[in-house]
Design a protein with these regions (language model features):
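Conserved acetyl-CoA-binding loop-helix of GNAT-fold acetyltransferases
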Residues: 85-100, 123-127
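Acetyl-CoA-dependent GNAT
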Residues: 13-76, 80-84, 99, 103
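Conserved SAM-binding loop
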Residues: 8, 85, 114
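Conserved N-terminal entry element of GNAT/NAT acetyltransferase domains
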Residues: 1-14, 148-149
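C-terminal "cap" of GNAT-fold acetyltransferases
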Residues: 3, 106-122, 126-149
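Short alpha-helical segment within the catalytic ATP-binding CA
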Residues: 78, 91, 120
Length: 149
């Protein structure tokens, strides 16, 4: 799937409720929000400032969160479960990073954390140009630039 028509929008009651119902197949079911209340996702104060959804053709195709920590922009995301495993994750990542950079007028490095065991996501991040930085407990950190971290 191409994500070229996707637009980053602030979460709303409707999109947050929809994302909370997403169900991933094993072994990715650890990312399910079903029956696991997520206080951060439901925190309306962060909608449009830290939390967004990617909308394409009037459908929620992704969830994006971002925080600036020590002048580093950290991004997290989830792609709609029905779109996962098709080899298009890197296109989703590229679209989300493009939209975040535009929204925040940000030209610096972007950082992501991912479970080291989530090889599907790791492949997508690498294909999108992110480079391994270091291990952080059971997660690995990637950046879109090679640098000392």
């Amino acid at each position: 799937m191409e994500f070229d028509r996707g637009l980053l929008q602030a979460l709303t009651e409707k999109t947050a409720a929809e994302i909370c119902k997403w169900a991933y197949d094993f072994p990715y079911n650890i990312y399910n929000f079903i029956n696991q209340p997520n206080e951060y996702l439901l925190n309306r104060e962060t909608w449009g400032t830290e939390q967004f959804c990617l909308i394409q053709d009037e459908k929620t195709v992704g969830y994006v969160s971002c925080q600036i920590e020590d002048d580093c922009l950290w991004i997290g995301w989830s792609m709609h479960p029905k779109l996962c495993g098709k080899g298009d994750g890197h296109l989703f990542v590229l679209k989300c990073t493009e939209e975040i950079k535009k929204r925040f007028n940000y030209e610096g490095s972007l950082y992501i954390r991912v479970a080291a065991s989530n090889q599907r996501a790791v492949k997508a991040y690498q294909k999108a140009g992110f480079v391994y930085q270091k291990q952080i407990q059971d997660e690995v950190a990637y950046s879109n630039h090679i640098e000392n971290f």
